[in-house]
């Protein structure tokens, strides 16, 4: 207040104003400060000062011919003064207004295309709904969020090449457009932006917004998808929040969401197969999300989620160095530890072999609904500061931290035996055994933990074993805070290794991720996920397995048929028949398999008993390890639609219906496709008709390699010999004729020779 009075006093003296306004500033330091470098030192002041002048803007001389000297109100729009140091004229802001209202119109067709992200944002806001404002304490935590809705996921380098190719196609410089998405986008944009008059620099800038994911590390309390982040300033303040539902979705959020669902499904499925890592890779490579290959999305998309990171690790990509436990992401912020195997006794006197971390360490824990800071020493929790959305979330974080601390009182709180198993029926490792046990019921754990008196610290409060807050007492070392803990901000990625059982380790051998950490939450994907791998057939239930298995046989009939006659064991062991086994009652799988294999062998031995329909129908039943028995079956049971349904060995049934005339297969009333066979297969003169131009030499001769199908014969050179599979599943040796003249006689002799060769 005193200072202000003093200044007022000074200003009232006549000389002061004169000195301040007229005197030159000649102190070198000040001149240097404000004139060195191109960077404006005080932009807002500069702007205000400029706009206070009459003609703060410069324009091209042509403006004087296109804009009148005065507007309708008689205000001057431009000055006859030239701009010092350029041949431009000085213009009033009013000239801009005049130009916007009365200036020439150009084609606006390219605007929505170039400024696509802005137009779409306006649409989303127009159709969005803003709800009531609530005043409450906001627990915000900084998270890395996507601030740019509606973008593709190109890397900066890929985008740069696309932009150069679209905007400056004639510029020199090597540009390599390799990825599918780069080529598609380039083609699309070149067509859209033909004859575009908008400045190339602007187009380039807008394209960048469309192609590259931009992330910022921002304090967020609610939704983190990009359509929520674009209105962050409208939906949450320090002490208020406004409910908001976006008026539209954007593909990048949908890709992130669908990628997580696909990755979870794949990891869960791979974990229960014989070779999890190989299965996982097979599935990632054969899956598409919204029409894009999943492996391409994984390479470009920075989403960090347990299942997604396991898939990335399997592909040899780098991932974040934080590790996951109990659904929380742990990041060590200080300290270090060494690991030692120890045997510990639970309260039930069960022995657990645990890798104990020896040493003092501090971690941040970030989960979906709670965050915490954890300080621990060897098998001792020193301090845990938690904040969460509600009591339940806080409790979850406390349980995870208590188990992670490996404290004795936690191990002694175990009641009953620990025998949790994963989806593949393998026992979980001891740390996850403990976690599951206490997640089911933490009462004893909290009761046995111990409580202490607490000091009154701003923003912190105690929590009792029954999860009620208290200002006097708290569970030992544990406090609840109003402030959230920020997510780990670094985008650094590290090289990791993955073992056969999908455990991901960093280069020091610490386990960062394992299938146990993959969430069981089921969601509905926003984009269509197409799993081409047979391993994922069961994701839509038993009927889908049934239909997919038979469709696979029909689609691959040519190769299946050859294998059936030449190498049946290899055919029976195909992974495509694996899902089908779960439909056959366990007790009888072996007998069915033995029965079908014997039946097939008879077909191979006895001429003329080859039956396409029957082979297709019974093939999946031959996949289980066979039990030798004398049992005969007239029908085979499969468990679909909640009960056992029968497939007849001879003839059609509601489950399997094959129409011989149309060659259409119907499974449970659903169309399962049409069998495309060799022409005329199954008619009597097949062999003679098809083998015109070939000489039949006799029985199959293994030296000439595996049997070809009739369609493949055309590739033979004249005089070349080959084994060929003919209509009834029999194999004969043929030679392509050297002369074409004798083709006619082949038809008659072929039939006789085949009979002889086979018999």
From Swiss-Prot:
Q: Which HAMAP family match?
A: INV_PB2 (MF_04062)
Listed GO MF terms: RNA binding; RNA-directed RNA polymerase activity
Record's function text: Plays an essential role in transcription initiation and cap-stealing mechanism, in which cellular capped pre-mRNAs are used to generate primers for viral transcription. Recognizes and binds the 7-methylguanosine-containing cap of the target pre-RNA which is subsequently cleaved after 10-13 nucleotides by the viral protein PA. Plays a role in the initiation of the viral genome replication and modulates the activity of the ribonucleoprotein (RNP) complex.
Native source species = Influenza A virus (strain A/Hong Kong/1/1968 H3N2)
Q: Where in the cell is it found?
A: Virion; Host nucleus; Host mitochondrion
Output this protein's name: Polymerase basic protein 2
Its BP terms in the Gene Ontology are: 7-methylguanosine mRNA capping; cap snatching; DNA-templated transcription; symbiont-mediated suppression of host cytoplasmic pattern recognition receptor signaling pathway via inhibition of MAVS activity; symbiont-mediated suppression of host gene expression; symbiont-mediated suppression of host mRNA transcription via inhibition of RNA polymerase II activity; viral RNA genome replication
Annotated Gene Ontology cellular component terms? host cell mitochondrion; host cell nucleus; virion component
An example Pfam family from this entry, by short name, is: Flu_PB2_6th
Chain span(s) of sequence motif Nuclear localization signal:
736-739
Q: Which family does it belong to?
A: Belongs to the influenza viruses PB2 family.
Site feature (Mammalian adaptation) residues = 627
Keywords, sorted A to Z: Cap snatching, Eukaryotic host gene expression shutoff by virus, Eukaryotic host transcription shutoff by virus, Host gene expression shutoff by virus, Host mitochondrion, Host nucleus, Host-virus interaction, Inhibition of host innate immune response by virus, Inhibition of host MAVS by virus, Inhibition of host RLR pathway by virus, Inhibition of host RNA polymerase II by virus, mRNA capping, mRNA processing, Viral immunoevasion, Viral transcription, Virion
State whether it acts alone or in a complex, and with which partners, per the record: Influenza RNA polymerase is composed of three subunits: PB1, PB2 and PA. Interacts (via N-terminus) with PB1 (via C-terminus). Interacts with nucleoprotein NP (via N-terminus). Interacts (via N-terminus) with host MAVS (via N-terminus); this interaction inhibits host innate immune response.
């Amino acid at each position: 207040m005193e200072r202000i009075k003093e200044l007022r006093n000074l200003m009232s003296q006549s000389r002061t104003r004169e000195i301040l306004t007229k005197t030159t500033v000649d102190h070198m330091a000040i001149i240097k400060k404000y004139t060195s470098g191109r960077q404006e030192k005080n932009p807002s002041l500069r702007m205000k000062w400029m706009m206070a002048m009459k003609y703060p803007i410069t324009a091209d001389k042509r403006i004087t011919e296109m804009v009148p000297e005065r507007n309708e109100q008689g205000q001057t729009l431009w000055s006859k003064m030239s701009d010092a140091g350029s041949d431009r004229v000085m213009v009033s802001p009013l000239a801009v207004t005049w130009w916007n209202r009365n200036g020439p119109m150009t084609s606006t067709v390219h605007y929505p295309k170039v400024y696509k992200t802005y137009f779409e944002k306006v649409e989303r806001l127009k159709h969005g709904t803003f709800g009531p404002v609530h005043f409450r304490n906001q627990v915000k935590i900084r998270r890395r969020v996507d601030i740019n809705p509606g973008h593709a996921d190109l890397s900066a380098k890929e985008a740069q090449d696309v932009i150069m190719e679209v905007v400056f196609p004639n510029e020199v410089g090597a540009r390599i457009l390799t990825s599918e998405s780069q080529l598609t986008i380039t083609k699309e944009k070149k067509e859209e932006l033909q004859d575009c008059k908008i400045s190339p620099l602007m187009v380039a800038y807008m394209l960048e917004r469309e192609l590259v994911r931009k992330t910022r590390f921002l304090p967020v309390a609610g939704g983190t998808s990009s359509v929520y982040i674009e209105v962050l300033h409208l939906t949450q303040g320090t002490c208020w929040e406004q409910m908001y539902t976006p008026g539209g979705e954007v593909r990048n959020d949908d890709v992130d969401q669908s990628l997580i669902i696909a990755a979870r499904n794949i990891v869960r499925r791979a974990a229960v197969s014989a070779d999890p890592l190989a299965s996982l890779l097979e599935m990632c490579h054969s899956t598409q999300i919204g029409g894009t290959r999943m492996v391409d999305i994984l390479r470009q998309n920075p989403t960090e989620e347990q299942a997604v990171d396991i898939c990335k690790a399997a592909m040899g990509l780098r991932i974040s160095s934080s590790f996951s436990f109990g659904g929380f992401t742990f990041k060590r912020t200080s300290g270090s530890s060494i690991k030692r195997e120890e045997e510990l006794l639970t309260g039930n006197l069960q022995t657990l072999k645990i890798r104990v971390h020896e040493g003092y360490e501090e971690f941040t824990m970030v989960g979906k609904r709670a965050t915490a800071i954890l300080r621990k020493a060897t098998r001792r929790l020193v301090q845990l500061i938690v904040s969460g959305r509600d009591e339940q979330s806080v409790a979850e974080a406390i349980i995870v931290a208590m188990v992670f601390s490996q404290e004795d009182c936690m191990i002694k709180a175990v009641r009953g035996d620990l025998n949790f198993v994963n989806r593949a029926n393998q026992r979980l490792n001891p740390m996850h055994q403990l976690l599951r046990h206490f997640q089911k019921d933490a009462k004893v754990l909290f009761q046995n933990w111990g409580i202490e008196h607490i000091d009154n610290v701003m923003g912190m409060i105690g929590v009792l074993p029954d999860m009620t807050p208290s200002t006097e007492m708290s569970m030992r070392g544990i406090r609840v805070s109003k402030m959230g803990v920020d997510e780990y901000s670094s985008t650094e990625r590290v090289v990791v290794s993955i073992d056969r059982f999908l455990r991901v380790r960093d280069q020091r051998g610490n386990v960062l991720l394992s299938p146990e950490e993959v969430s069981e939450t089921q969601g509905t994907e926003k984009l269509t996920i197409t799993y081409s791998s047979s391993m994922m057939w069961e994701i839509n239930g038993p009927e889908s397995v049934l239909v997919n298995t038979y469709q696979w046989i029909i689609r691959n009939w040519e190769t299946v048929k050859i294998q059936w006659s030449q190498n049946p064991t290899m055919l029976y062991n195909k992974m495509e028949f694996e899902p089908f086994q779960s439909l056959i009652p366990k007790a009888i799988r072996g007998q069915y398999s033995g029965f079908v294999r014997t039946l097939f062998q008879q077909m191979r031995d006895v001429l003329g008993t080859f039956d396409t329909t029957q082979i297709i129908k019974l093939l999946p039943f031959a996949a289980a390890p066979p039990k030798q028995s004398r049992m005969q079956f007239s029908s085979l049971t499969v468990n679909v639609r909640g009960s056992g349904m029968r497939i007849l060995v001879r003839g059609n049934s509601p489950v399997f219906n094959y129409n011989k005339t149309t060659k259409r297969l119907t499974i449970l009333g659903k169309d399962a496709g049409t069998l495309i066979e060799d022409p005329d297969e199954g008619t009597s003169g097949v062999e003679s008709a098809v083998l015109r131009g070939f000489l039949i030499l006799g029985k199959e001769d293994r030296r000439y390699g595996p049997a070809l199908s009739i369609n493949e014969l055309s590739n033979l050179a004249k005089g070349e010999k080959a084994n060929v599979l003919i209509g009834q599943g029999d194999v004969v040796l043929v030679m392509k004729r050297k002369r074409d003249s004798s083709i006619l006689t082949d038809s008659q002799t072929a039939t006789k020779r085949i009979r002889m060769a086979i018999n």
